């Protein structure tokens, strides 16, 4: 079921939703499932699952030099979304982000989500890297959420990003987007920010 159906009926029926983070790498799902077990009595309409991109950390070597390593502290958004939907039969909305993902990564993520029967997405640019002054896309990645949304819409229309037709397209994704109510820090003004939201 598409989340828009819940939202369109919102005036008649109030409800809750929750947002969860994937477990830290190596921690398993037990604590997350205990949290959902405690919250499911509120009958959540859906559960959002955040996505966290990789970051670089510096580790000291035995010789005193530093080495830069790529670390993803919270992997598994797609797998967690599938596990929650399967275990609890509650619709899920995984976050799909530009940060740390190439267009190919996103295409494979969309395929994985479709295989799992997950049709609701929250499409976001994602945060800039911790030490960066401004957002820098991954090589062959998207700079803006609007570009990512175009890729999802092309997938919905039955085409991979290289233009190849999808032989057996699955259910189309229902996409949500987000904005900052006070204006995004990179937008020159509120009007321009609204223009990008409407794209």
For the regions a protein language model found, what residue spans apply to each?
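Glycine-rich, proline-tolerant flexible connector loops at the mouths of alpha/beta enzymes
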Residues: 23, 42-75, 129-139, 199
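Flexible, glycine-rich active-site loops centered on histidine and acidic residues
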Residues: 102-154
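Alpha-helix-loop-beta-strand connector modules within alpha/beta enzyme cores
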Residues: 61-94, 140-177
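Active-site mouth loops of central-metabolism enzymes
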Residues: 15-33, 91-104, 174-194
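Conserved, mostly hydrophobic/aromatic
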Residues: 19, 47, 113
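N-terminal amphipathic alpha-helix/helix-capping segment at the start of soluble metabolic enzymes
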Residues: 1-18, 160-173
């Amino acid at each position: 079921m598409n989340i828009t159906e819940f939202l369109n009926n919102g005036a008649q029926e109030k409800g809750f939703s929750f947002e969860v983070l994937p477990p830290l790498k190596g921690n398993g799902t037990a604590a997350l499932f205990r949290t959902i077990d405690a919250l499911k009595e509120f009958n959540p309409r859906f559960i959002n699952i955040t996505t966290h991109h990789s970051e670089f950390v510096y580790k000291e070597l035995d010789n005193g030099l530093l080495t830069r390593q790529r670390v993803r502290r919270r992997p598994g958004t797609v797998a967690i979304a599938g596990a929650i939907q399967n275990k609890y039969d509650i619709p899920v909305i995984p976050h799909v982000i530009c940060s740390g993902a190439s267009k190919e990564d996103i295409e494979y993520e969309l395929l994985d989500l479709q295989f799992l029967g997950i049709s609701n997405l929250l499409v976001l640019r994602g945060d800039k890297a911790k030490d960066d002054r401004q957002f820098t896309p991954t090589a062959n990645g998207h700079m803006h959420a609007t570009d990512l949304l175009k890729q999802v819409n092309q997938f919905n229309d039955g085409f991979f990003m290289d233009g190849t037709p999808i032989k057996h397209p699955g259910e189309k994704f229902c996409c949500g987007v987000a904005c900052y109510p006070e204006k995004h820090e990179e937008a020159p003004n509120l009007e321009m920010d609204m223009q990008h939201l409407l794209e």
